[in-house]
Amino acid sequence: GKPVEGWNPQKTDKPVVSKVQHFRVADKDYIVFADRYRFYILDRKGKERVRVSSVFDLKPHTDVYLTRKGGQPVLVFAGKGGQIHVVNFSGQTETSRVEGLSDRFEMNIVDWDGNGNGDVLFTDGNRVLVTRLDGTPLFEKKMEAKTLGFPYVYRFSAKDVRVGLTD
């Protein structure tokens, strides 16, 4: 593609801890990323498109996911201490907590129950856990492995979704 004329992003308060990602929602472009405490949603010229006033405590290599909640698009990412942060495209945030997660968990998003909304898939040590975005548990299983890696999601069809795990 061509460089965007007028690209002039604001400076972050702290070093960036997530990938800089582009999402297109309802015919609008959103550039999203996070530093240690703030979440940024910019337009394609680097100006703030959505103000997120909440403060977070994020770990390095925070992943940001676009999914749906209640039929509406939202951005989801995890904080320290098992927190799940949900940010909508008006800048409103919701935070829930999943008890019993270490700071070494891995996370992905999957529509576990086929209802069209994202659910959170965690691996933590030898445990696999799926919760709703509000932290309500849907599934949990302990595996024989000592430490599970990132939980990959494979969608073969609308009704055939599988999770791939490594140890």
Positions of predicted regions on the chain:
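Extracytoplasmic/lumenal domain signature
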Residues: 1-167
